[in-house]
Amino acid sequence: MAASVEYFPYYSPPSHQHPLPSPVPPPPSHISPPPPPFSPPHHPPPPHFSPPHQPPPSPYPHPHPPPPSPYPHPHQPPPPPHVLPPPPPTPAPGHHVIIVVVISLGSLFFLAFLAAALFCYLKKRRKSSTKAEIIEFDEHLKVQETIVQGPHGEQTRVVMLEEDIHLVEDIHKTEKLSRPSHLSSTGRHAIDISDPNHHFTEQKS
């Protein structure tokens, strides 16, 4: 005949080691009065069960500081202060005046040199003329002498001079350009000077 089995609640045997105490909170910043002493009960606890040891509750709960971060942040140096560069020094007003005067004088000298070079070039291109004068001088002198009787019976010699002058001027003008073509012009001028009668009177006693 089978025996009836009764099940009773099972209790674990008491351990010989005390449980680990809970972490103690950090001391408060201000001093609080100590808690009243805990008095144990007069009757001993049952041998098979021991209550866990709990610390007395604090009269005022204090906030715990946050735990430190497991990964510390690298320390970054502060950025250097922003320094504005000093403004460039303002040039003296006389400096600009000197530059303008020098540039003006240089431009004037350059223009004068350019004008002189252009003048020389045009002078070379201008026609160069050579002038040759040929003068022909022809003079004819005719002398005629006569003796006449004067009013008082004396003899008078009369000399008649006839002078014939021919002046011929021949001007040859040659104009030569810088180009190969040559121009020549010849001008002939004839000047005839004729004085037909020159009378000289000579008296003879």
Swiss-Prot record:
Q: In which tissues is it expressed?
A: Expressed preferentially in differentiating vessel elements in seedlings.
Q: Which UniProt keywords apply?
A: Cell membrane, Cell wall, Cell wall biogenesis/degradation, Developmental protein, Membrane, Secreted, Transmembrane, Transmembrane helix
Question: Can you quote a single GO CC term?
Answer: plant-type cell wall
| Pro residues composition bias: residue spans | 20-88
Region Disordered: list its residue ranges: 13-88, 176-205
Query: Which ranges does the record list as Cytoplasmic topological domains?
Result: 118-205
Which stretches of this protein does UniProt put in the Extracellular compartment? 1-96
Q: Null mutant: what phenotype?
A: Constitutive loss of function results in seedling lethality. In conditional loss of function, aberrant secondary cell wall (SCW) formation of root vessel elements; this phenotype is stronger in double mutant plants lacking both TED6 and TED7.
List residues traversing the bilayer. 97-117
Biased composition range(s): Basic and acidic residues:
189-205
Q: Briefly, what is this protein's role? A: Essential protein. Involved in the secondary cell wall (SCW) formation of vessel elements (e.g. protoxylem and metaxylem), thus promoting tracheary element (TE) differentiation.
Q: What name does the UniProt record give this protein?
A: Protein TRACHEARY ELEMENT DIFFERENTIATION-RELATED 7
